């Protein structure tokens, strides 16, 4: 499967050192020091349950000199007392975790960060100011895939494609072999393995318009999702389908 090289920039920004234009290490170091923060992606996703919009996720992804920062805010659009959540994910240029933070308007927060050879999660509940701690025997290269934040799925797609795709003859050649990832779900205080696989191009309706997008499947022990990204626009996530939950997520 081949795709336009125009998408390489976004793939490279978060996890694709192998796809970056080759240069001497000293030159890259100097360029990294001088590079200003760059907006990689921003926007919002509408989250629909049985066809009704129930929440909106607003997000931004910034590439800085030596790190990437992914910020997201989730706001419920239904209910008399809607709850909002926000998350901040910071990673190194090679995709290793620096820090993850989550909080919600009704109280409660958590942080995750590397601690020696494992990850440490600190959880503060609305009823207690003293945080509980939970270690995970996982490397800092593990992906964060928290509940309700679909931008985390976009970052995982880029990470998968960074490993699966290589420049060849002016195009990007992608293997369709599945990729396995160890991920942490901070709100659930659990870790798991997930598998992502490139399916290929499909025509699908997005906001009433037929689009040709690239489909990937994301699977775990108890879930099976379909994700569609736009190869013409830096592999940005456009749609997610979660059939078991009657849920669809669409970029606004």
Regions found by a protein language model. Give the residues of each.
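Acidic/charged, solvent-exposed loop-and-adjacent secondary-structure segments enriched in E/D, K/R, S/T
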Residues: 123-149
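Bacterial N-terminal signal peptides
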Residues: 10-20
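Acidic, serine/threonine-rich low-complexity disordered tracts
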Residues: 25-126, 131, 162-252
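Bacterial N-terminal signal peptides that target proteins for export
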Residues: 1-11
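Helix-centric, low-specificity signal for extended rod-like, repetitive segments
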Residues: 2, 21-22, 146
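Beta-strand/loop-rich accessory regions of lumenal/periplasmic or secreted enzymes
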Residues: 139-177
